[in-house]
Amino acid sequence: IENLGVTLVEHMPVNGLVLGENGVHGVLTEQGEFNAERVVIAGGAWSARLLESTGMTLPIRPVRGQMILYRAEPNVVQRIVLSRDRYVIPRRDGRILVGSTTEEVGFDKSTTPAAMQELESEACRLIPALAGYEIEHHWAGLRPGSPNGIPYILQHPRIEGLFINTGHFRNGVVLGLASARLLADMLLGQQPILDPTPYSG
């Protein structure tokens, strides 16, 4: 991507937008201003906060999901297991991911013993062999929830050059490629790969 003239700036929190009379001009960060003719708000659970300065209220809320990771040998679990909003995902190195909770607790990313116990119990119900393995890690993340579970993929209705791609909730990995392609078509002014109306809020 760098060969196309793109500069990647990682681990740089965006604190606000640079807005002018004729649209968006960039973003504000702790390291200063980054200028751009087009800006995409893809801030997950924080997207609504970034849009506040534009006068747009987007009903995106943080939904906490806690997960655990087992240390095991390869092939203890050989395929993904899905059951009642829970999943068990084997990794190539033998580690096994189990998730996840769905908690309406605002921007709180802390973990709880109750969630760990519930995930461990569910993991051992689905894969009894996991009872013999150690839980290596327990963490939480925040997902961007939308009222009807449908993401927002659109151009800002009033600000030229400002685009939005958020609200994928638990389906970010599943919907990511199609979502990015639809947004790319919008950014480039091309015929979209699918009707964007359902994602326009």
Task: State each model region's role.
Residues 33-34, 38-160:
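Active-site substrate-recognition segment that forms the wall
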Residues 26-28, 97, 163-164:
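General beta-strand recognition
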Residues 127-201:
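C-terminal catalytic lobe of FAD-dependent flavoproteins
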Residues 1-7:
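N-terminal Rossmann-like dinucleotide/flavin-binding domain of flavoprotein oxidoreductases
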Residues 10-25:
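A conserved short coil-to-beta-strand element within the FAD-binding core of flavoproteins
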Residues 22-27, 76-78:
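Short, hydrophobic/aromatic-rich segments at coil-to-beta transitions
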Residues 7-9, 136:
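General small-molecule cofactor/ligand-binding pocket signal
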Residues 12, 44-45, 177:
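Alpha-helix N-cap/helix-start capping motif
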